[in-house]
Amino acid sequence: MGKERTAAITRVVVPLAHGFEEIETVTVVDILRRAGISVTVAGVETGSPPGAIEGRTGIRLVPDLSIAGVQASDFDMIVLPGGLKGAQTLQKDTRVARLLRSLQDNDRYIAAICAAPTVLASHGMIAGRRLTSHPSVKDQLAGAIYDEQRVVVDGRLVTSRGPGTAMEFALVLVEILEGKQKVEEVKQEVLARL
């Protein structure tokens, strides 16, 4: 797992909608940025520039830009945060659907945590794929090979279960994108014992 380090900066996009799960979102964005990965948080709500987007517990985040300004060719990975309401909004957003399809068609990584694998299911992207999710949405993932591991990697699809697995999920993403040494550096910096 992981790629050889190159001079190119790895780029990740994180779409954000009202009702996102804060722990999952902030943990992933923070850990990836600590690893030197360029992370763009793209708001799917209306408005330009996008205003603050409220998470499921009321914490507000301001996206870097609107999803309308995102080009799939600019990114190596997309990470879909959970939070049921946020995931439901991502399911309905045609721009997110186009972005997912383009990334998949170009053999890029797709990652989803908690309720977010339902976004992939709603776009017919999980049939025969091994994945996991928050237990509350398991029944919405028909056609997938469901696995209860905390983080599941199936080719270029990475899924995880929920807020309590966010750090492990983020570190697996770092390993995939930047290698094991970078994971160890980040773990040492944040005092992670995973």
What are the roles of these predicted feature ranges?
Residues P135-V137:
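Long, charge-patterned amphipathic alpha-helical coiled-coil/hairpin "stalk" segments used as oligomerization
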Residues M1-R108, V119-G128, Q140-E148, R156-L194:
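Extended, subdomain-level signal for the structured scaffold at the beginning of enzyme domains
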Residues L131:
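Anionic-ligand binding patches
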